[in-house]
Every structure is written in structure tokens, then in C-alpha cells.
Amino acid sequence: MIPALFLVICVVAFRAMTGLLIHSGAATWLSNFAPLAAIALCCAAYLPSRYKFTLPLVTLFISDLILNATYHAALFDPQILCRYLALAVVGLIGFALRRRATWKTMLPASLATSVIFYGITNAFSWLTDPGYAKNFAGLVQALTVGLPQYAATPSWMFFRNSLLSDFAFTAVFVLLMRVQSPRASAEVAVARAA
């Protein structure tokens, strides 16, 4: 449990630092390389009931506080609320895997939830952003290149980085859960059954 909580703390620091680097223009290639979906998936699968959903959402909220203050963005708007909803869907999938969370289930689930998260958030952007035509071509634009003002980081790049980061951070989380002492692993197994 302690390694998992340590990882969540590291996630906030990682997301805040990469967000600040991206904002400064020093690391645009890191756009959307964030471990939040992996944390939502893994927390729901591995952690005790009181942490399953609250920890990922609190992690997102704290990192949003830092980044939105930097970007001078609103803390709550429809796009952000959609992101929270999509993260909750990812958590529900992790919750469904809680009794069979292994390498064989969690790594493919990380890829599937990346697709789901990307689909939900980009479809929402397409539906709500007046910059997209409300037809199939507009949806394809939202899913591939995005809006012209964001040409430096097209949508497909966000998706690629999301896939890579979700897979990598899920692997790290599962590894940390596996290397715990037998006693800690037994505590997690008992907590998962609750």
C-alpha cells in the first residue's frame, strides 16, 4: 500500500512538472504524457475501498489546481468536468478488474482505457467546440489533428502519449504492488475483497 501511495504523490509532482515544462515550451513532446488514467485504473483495482476513486480524483484535482493557475484557466468548465467523468469510467473498469488484477489483465486494460478516455474527451470536444464542424469530417478532425491553433501538438500525438504513459505507469504500479512484502500483499488482497 505504501508504494502505491508514494506513486500517487509522485504522479502529482510528475504531472505538475511536465505541465510546467510544456507551458514553458521546453517539452511540448510531453503533451498528455500523464499517469492519471493509469492511476485511476490501478487504484480502483488494487487499493482499499476508501481510496479506489477518491485518490485518483484528488490527484487530478490537485494537479489541476497547480496547472490551471499556471495557464490562467478556469478550474471547472465543461471540458474539465468531462475529463473527470472519463477518469471515473476508467476507474470503473479498474474496479471491475479488482479480483483479477494481474499483468495479463491490467496492461491490456490500460490500452483499452486509453482508447476510451481519448474517445470520450475528444468526442466531447467535437460536440462542444464551435471550431469543429458537426459532421463526420469534424469528428475525424477532433480525433486526429485537432484545431488549427493547436497544430504544434495534434490530437493523435496526445493519444500516442496517453497510450505510452498509461501503459508505462500501469506497468510500474503493478510492479510496485507485486514487489511488496507478502504481508502487505495479503492486506491488499483482503482489502480488495471488501
Where are these regions (language model features)?
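Short, charged juxtamembrane terminal tails flanking transmembrane helices
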Residues: 1, 184-194
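Hydrophobic transmembrane alpha-helices
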Residues: 1-54
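Membrane-embedded alpha-helical segments of multi-pass membrane proteins
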Residues: 5, 30-42, 80-89, 164-168
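Hydrophobic alpha-helical transmembrane segments
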Residues: 4-6, 53-54, 81-85, 107-111, ...
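Membrane-embedded alpha-helical hairpins and interfacial helices in multi-pass inner-membrane proteins
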Residues: 102-182, 186-187
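Central hydrophobic cores of alpha-helical transmembrane segments
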Residues: 7, 53-63, 106-115, 173, ...
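Interfacial aromatic-anchored transmembrane helix boundaries in multi-pass membrane proteins
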Residues: 16-32, 59-93
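Structural signal for the C-terminal ends of transmembrane alpha-helices
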Residues: 16-17, 42-50, 89, 93-101, ...
